[in-house]
């Protein structure tokens, strides 16, 4: 029996306040579910602006506890109501002064399954993330959801192939890459890195990028969200480069086995030969 997962991504622009951003994403989750979506991922730091264009402690106020905070709780209820797996990229507070760039994963019955904390934190013009986030400490977890084995790899993480591979070794079938990435800096990489990672690791990737220029800086977020399959092929069209868009795509999960039987990368990999990768 064939296995197909209908998956959704939302790329959107900053609305001006946290509550309206949360409302927009909840509405989009309902729209996606109405189209049959079984799993959905939001963009990086989904309920806020991309405040890392500046270094301002006022934005620490965007932090919430996960899963005890109100946004996780709210979307647990949404997930249960809709029967949809939700991936929620947020700004996590552990305690005052200790914050992470995190994605919570909620199963289709509303159960909180766990979190992924962004491992690689940039600190360059327009992306002053070390001011806000501590590097992740939770490894590369895989979440056993109603639609299969889901992983998360956030934005700047995507430039580091080691994490993509760790997610594959840990059993990922779909990996979501919620991002906030700017046209002038990385657009030439956007359609190269994730397809290459999907091929090398033989799973689906959902890549999400916000859209628009926000009041905090010159970063021009270019959308162009997409799903890519284990053969490196885009699943349907990519998202618009300038406008908010909800993407809903059917993922043929049987293709994963076909590709892994064709290219036995997991059989042929050589962990014993990779010691150099752990050296500074």
Language model feature labels by segment:
Residues 88-90, 102-105, 141, 225-227, ...:
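Short beta-strand scaffold segments in enzyme catalytic cores
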Residues 7, 105-113, 228-236, 240:
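Short, glycine-anchored, charge-dense loop/turn motifs used at functional sites
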Residues 102, 115-117, 177, 237-238, ...:
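Residue-level detector of high-confidence beta-strand sites
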Residues 1-38, 176:
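N-terminal active-site segment of His-dependent metallophosphoesterases
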Residues 18, 26-109, 115, 181-201:
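Cys-nucleophile CN-hydrolase/nitrilase-fold catalytic domain and related Cys-dependent amidase chemistry
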Residues 254-280:
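A conserved C-terminal secondary-structure "cap"
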Residues 64-67, 77, 94-173, 183-196, ...:
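Active-site catalytic loop in hydrolytic enzyme cores
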Residues 67-87, 149, 155-245:
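CN hydrolase (nitrilase-like) catalytic-core segments centered on the catalytic cysteine
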């Amino acid at each position: 029996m064939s296995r197909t997962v209908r998956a959704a991504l939302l790329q959107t622009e900053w609305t001006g306040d946290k509550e309206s951003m949360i409302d927009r994403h909840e509405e989009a989750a309902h729209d996606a579910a109405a189209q049959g979506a079984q799993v959905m991922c939001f963009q990086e730091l989904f309920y806020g602006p991309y405040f890392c264009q500046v270094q301002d402690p006022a934005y620490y106020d965007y932090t919430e506890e996960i899963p005890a905070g109100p946004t996780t709780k709210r979307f647990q209820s949404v997930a249960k109501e809709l029967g949809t797996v939700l991936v929620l990229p947020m700004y996590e507070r552990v305690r005052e002064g200790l914050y992470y760039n995190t994605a919570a994963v909620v199963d289709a019955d509303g159960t909180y399954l766990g979190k992924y904390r962004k491992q690689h934190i940039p600190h360059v013009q327009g992306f002053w993330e070390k001011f806000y986030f501590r590097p992740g400490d939770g490894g590369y977890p895989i979440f056993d959801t109603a639609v299969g084995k889901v992983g998360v790899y956030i934005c700047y993480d995507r430039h580091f192939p080691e994490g993509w591979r760790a997610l594959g070794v840990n059993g990922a079938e779909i990996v979501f890459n919620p991002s906030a990435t700017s046209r002038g800096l990385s657009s030439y990489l956007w359609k190269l890195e994730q397809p290459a990672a999907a091929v090398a690791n033989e799973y689906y990737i959902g890549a999400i990028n916000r859209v628009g220029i926000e009041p905090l800086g010159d970063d021009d977020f270019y959308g162009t969200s997409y799903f890519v399959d284990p053969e490196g092929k885009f699943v349907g069209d990519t998202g618009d480069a300038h406008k908010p868009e909800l993407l809903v795509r059917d993922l043929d999960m049987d293709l994963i086995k076909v590709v892994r039987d064709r290219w036995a990368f997991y059989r042929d990999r050589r962990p014993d030969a990779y010691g150099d990768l752990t050296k500074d």
